Amino acid sequence: MKRSEINAALKEMEQMVQKYRFALPPFCNFTPEEWGKKGHDYDEIRDNMLGWDITDYGLGDFDKVGFSLITIRNGNLNMKDKYTKTYAEKLLYIKEGQYS
């Protein structure tokens, strides 16, 4: 996917989330530069792969096939001594007419 398509998908999902008055965690809006300055206090976010996923499954037609996802919480069975959650919380957004 082109960066412009990813940015448009992010913006569309952000608007939907705002419409329903759901508050995203601050890390969903960090820039790459901000992430570069984040220390070990943010390892849980990195280790558990929290944040955005936008995909068109490599097919090149996001409007027809794909989805947007935000992982807010995620279990990590590989690091269960450090992270005890055994569940995930995710927001999934599929546009009308879009297949996933």
Predicted regions and their residues:
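Short, conserved beta-strand element in jelly-roll/cupin
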Residues: T86-Y87, L91-G97
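A short, N-terminal "cap"/entry segment at the start of jelly-roll beta-barrel domains
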Residues: M1-T86
